[in-house]
UniProtKB/Swiss-Prot annotation:
It comes from the Bacteria. This is Lipoyl synthase 1. The lineage of its organism: Bacteria, Bacillati, Cyanobacteriota, Cyanophyceae, Nostocales. Pfam families: Radical_SAM. Pathway: Protein modification; protein lipoylation via endogenous pathway; protein N(6)-(lipoyl)lysine from octanoyl-[acyl-carrier-protein]: step 2/2. It catalyses: [[Fe-S] cluster scaffold protein carrying a second [4Fe-4S](2+) cluster] + N(6)-octanoyl-L-lysyl-[protein] + 2 oxidized [2Fe-2S]-[ferredoxin] + 2 S-adenosyl-L-methionine + 4 H(+) = [[Fe-S] cluster scaffold protein] + N(6)-[(R)-dihydrolipoyl]-L-lysyl-[protein] + 4 Fe(3+) + 2 hydrogen sulfide + 2 5'-deoxyadenosine + 2 L-methionine + 2 reduced [2Fe-2S]-[ferredoxin]. It is an enzyme of class 2 (transferase). Binds 2 [4Fe-4S] clusters per subunit. One cluster is coordinated with 3 cysteines and an exchangeable S-adenosyl-L-methionine. GO terms for molecular function: 4 iron, 4 sulfur cluster binding; lipoate synthase activity; metal ion binding. The keyword ATP-binding does not apply.
Length: 291
């Protein structure tokens, strides 16, 4: 099934604004998941002046068959100037909300937790009004590394579930479904004031019942925010799309998620984990939490 339906077509962006964002990113030698992972919303987000920064290099120590980020068994050493450069980009782009994510760095003892902390600190120093969302890997179950990140007090902790348990071995062979749930649960226990978030992609052969079960599992660990989007095959080398889920089904999942008690459900064919992430500021105003 290779022909994309009409609902997956994206509008052409205003390239002047996109060019301005790209110029800042190139000038500061920064990576974004928008570019590295070939996100279909790159034009819309860059046009709005937002980006999801990808730290710790453009290469990942895992080779998940759905992901378009490059694989390297031994990536380069961390760049000590990266946190400062990232913070400068936040300042130049005047971001109200920033998403900081990373490749998996299983080669590092703390999985890169210390680099997340440094990035958070630098952003706080130059743009204290900016809310910060970190989209983190599973840290190989290193819960002390998780605690280190949370002690830096990001407003949102995002860790993606990606798919249903039955498909984990094929889609996310180095991941673990139970570990993902435990990470989210521990995050809530360590930092009760935190907003937790997770996302799944569909179109890989899952059933409606299986998606609903994942949603129930996420609510059972008190996950606040859920994103659901259509998987799109980045290249012929990657996993094939099994089916294109209709907008009506995405809408039904949104309704179900709200019934389960998620504070926010973003569910549509083009939804990605950081899509419209800045809307969390309104959510924080509606559901305030004290540290």
């Amino acid at each position: 099934m290779t022909v994309k339906p009409d609902w997956l077509r994206v509008k052409a962006p205003q390239w002047e604004r996109v060019g301005n964002v790209k110029e800042i990113l190139r000038d500061l030698a920064l990576n974004t998941v928008c570019e590295e992972a070939s996100c279909p919303n790159i034009g819309e987000c860059f046009q709005a002046g937002t980006a999801t920064f990808l730290i710790m290099g453009p290469a990942c120590t895992r080779a998940c068959p759905y992901c378009d980020i490059d694989f390297e068994k031994k990536p380069k050493a961390l760049d000590p100037t990266e946190p400062t450069r990232l913070a400068e980009a936040v300042r130049r782009m005047r971001l109200n909300h920033v998403v900081i994510t990373s490749v998996n760095r299983d080669d590092l003892p703390d999985g890169g937790a210390s680099q997340f902390v440094k990035c958070i600190a630098e952003v706080r120093a130059v743009s204290p009004q900016t809310t910060i969302e970190v989209l983190i890997p599973d840290l190989c179950g290193n819960w002390e590394a998780l605690r280190i990140i949370l002690q830096a007090s990001p407003e949102v902790l995002n860790h993606n579930t990606e798919t249903i348990p039955r498909l984990y071995r094929r889609v996310r062979p180095q991941g673990n479904y139970d570990r993902t749930l435990e990470l989210l649960q521990r995050s809530r226990q360590i930092a009760p004031w935190l907003y937790t978030k997770s996302g799944i992609m569909v179109g890989l052969g899952e059933t409606n019942a299986e998606v609903r079960q994942v949603m129930q599992d996420l609510r059972a660990v008190d996950c606040d925010i859920l994103t659901i989007g259509q998987y799109l095959q980045p290249s012929q080398k990657h996993l094939q799309v099994n089916d294109f889920v209709t907008p009506e089904q995405f809408a039904a999942w949104q309704v179900y998620g709200e019934e389960l008690g998620f504070l926010q459900v973003v569910s549509s064919p083009l939804t990605r984990s950081s899509y419209h992430a800045e809307q969390v500021r309104q959510l924080m105003e509606r559901y305030p939490r004290n540290k």
